[in-house]
Amino acid sequence: MKDPKFTHLYEMAKKELLEDILPFWEKYDVDEENGGFYGVVTREGMPVKGGTKCLVLNARLVWTFASAYRILKDEKYLKLAKRAYDYFCEYFIDKQYGGCYFMLDCKGNAIDDKKFVYGQAFAIYALSEYCRATGDTEARDKAVAIRDLLEQHAYTPDHPGYIEILARDWSYNPANQGSNINPEAEATKTMNTHLHLIEAYTGLLRVLRTPEQIAKVRQHLNIMLDKVYDSEIHHFKMFFRDDWSWTTPEISYGHDIEGTWLMTETAEVLGEKDMEEKSAPKCLAMAAACLEESILPDGSMIYEYNPVTRHINTNRSWWVQAETVVGFLNAWQMSGEQRFLDASLKAFEYIDLFVVDHEYGEWFTMLG
């Protein structure tokens, strides 16, 4: 018998997806003038003239509509997925050097052609899911091509991991490294990029189960568990030098709770008992630390904490609240501990009350 709280959470989430989120993008974001989807729309759903088109958003659109079609079997989502995929392949993929541009203008011209590894990860993730949903192996081949470029140019074998930024031609400039989430941080390697790389490589493993891909996913999981995860405090470190020595003490609770379910998923897809046994206790410990340290009485999760200065960033970001729901739900499924399901449900109730824009649709970006 299913837990009634889980059933309630499931029904709320399903309603939000099918009656708010997906319809908003279908109704307001299709760019009939320039192709693909608008980069920016107003709260009311009006396109912002001249709005740029970002690699991360467009990759996520490919992933979202492909995933929606795979699960819901509704042909309208296949049509939207194909629209997103076709635009992505035509305009974001660099035909000369490979990989993907980071930013386009509204007409599809590259205005930031750097190869952010974080962005390439989203491209692999999107193309892999499109293949998984449609059976189109050409999408998988495109994902593999990007993976191979990352392995050739971004991977650092002396201290296994991946650098942050390369030029359009994949050349590397040590002075041009930094975090996409905090440009001021000293960072050759970051938690955020590696978190999305493990997500991307796991997605590719679902459609490319080769010894090479299995080995890379195993390595990614070990990097997250051994280098990024701090077993003393049960949190991720965020910013690192090339040798994996960390540079700043901040804790990002949203990334932590996101990491708990992503690493669980990776271990499950990998299907190796020793990696599941290594990953599970660390994921649960981090979920417990997030629950104890970052959840406010209303069920929301704070953004960030610096244990040295004791500064707390209490802003409530949309994505942090979404990851709170998923991460605590995963922790409940792993452990059976009711406190995690309660926290997941309360986080979604907070989202429904404050984050969802019930007047115009979709979600607010940030709450104070």
Model-derived features: where do they sit?
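Glycan-recognition and catalytic cores of secretory/periplasmic carbohydrate-active enzymes
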Residues: 1-368
